Amino acid sequence: MLDLSKNPLFDLNSRTLSVDERVALSYARARLVLRSYNLSISDVQSFTPKFWAMHLDPILPLDFGCFTILAAHLNLTVGTIARYLPQQPDLIPLVKSLLNLDTVGVFLLSERGHGLDAFNIETTATKYKNGFILHTPREEATKFMPATTPAFGIPKVAVVMARIIVDGEDRGSRFFLVPICTAKEMYPGVTSTRLPRRSGTSPLDFSMTSFNHVFLPASALLGGSLDAPTDARSAWWDEVWRIPYGSMAVAAPLMQGLKHVAYIGAQYSLRRHVRVHGPTPVPIMTFPTQQLAVLYAVAAGTILDVWYRSINLWTTASSTAWPWW
């Protein structure tokens, strides 16, 4: 396990910073973490122990904005693209840029009008000559809510789910690779509207993203097939196969955070003294009510950590090995 706590980026008191300064710090920390672990394409695709070790780094509960960037970037964007590298090796330079966080990957699936029913998304990619026209047909089809602004000096690229339309026929939903912004500005036809900050969380530049007749080359389609699936729902689940793993990753910093809380609570309970019946102060850890709370947190953190690591081993064993890489 790496010791990132000694790095100056994690020694800053972010509570004294402005919202935008905190967001910028989260991006800088995410880049530091990813470069420190130096993950390969195979690590991401095959869920190696090194891949899960990054998610379980005890530094991540200190900045959930940083973890949010990493979780979506690696699990959803890089993981989705990596599946198609054997058929589209021209994407390898992009994936290497993503793994170095020189470029941030964004996963645009759900829409303002389609969250849990994302199978029914409305964004379209209409076949046009040697490419596609990506378009948001109405406000409810705006992609919600990954961070897509150029405000923090990092280029962003997205995997965008859209319905393929060929000669007026709906061929089902597929992922397209779409440049979102440079380090300074949005690409033509792409609009990002930043959402208000959510209270009680690490801030990020969460946004609503829409497309106005954006031309995409044929190579933007991940997988390349224009055929309509025989089973549209099964095909859709196959497209979004990384989501269950991404959902599992979200629990990692929460369990590390529980262990942090248990340690802090135990140390405080040993240090804090009060007078009870006699003149000599005693630590509040001597009270059964305090012992129960601390020991419960220690037990829960330990058991969940063992359980989570066993699930990690299952994902590694069940993944497809990549002998070509």
Residue ranges and their predicted role:
Residues 133-191:
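A short core secondary-structure module
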Residues 109-117, 140-142:
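Sensory/regulatory domains in signal-transduction proteins
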Residues 1-104, 115-116, 127-133, 316-321:
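Amphipathic, small/basic residue-rich leader segments at the start of a protein or domain
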Residues 118-120, 153-155, 170-171, 204-206:
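Short, solvent-exposed loop/turn segments at the edges of secondary structure
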Residues 122-126:
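Hydrophobic/aromatic beta-strand elements that line small-molecule binding cavities or substrate pockets
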Residues 121, 144-148, 195-197:
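Short beta-alpha junctions and helix-cap segments that line functional grooves
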Residues 102-109, 190-193:
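Short Pro/Gly-enriched beta-strand edge/turn motifs at strand-loop
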Residues 127-136, 171, 178-325:
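Internal glycine-rich alpha/beta core junctions
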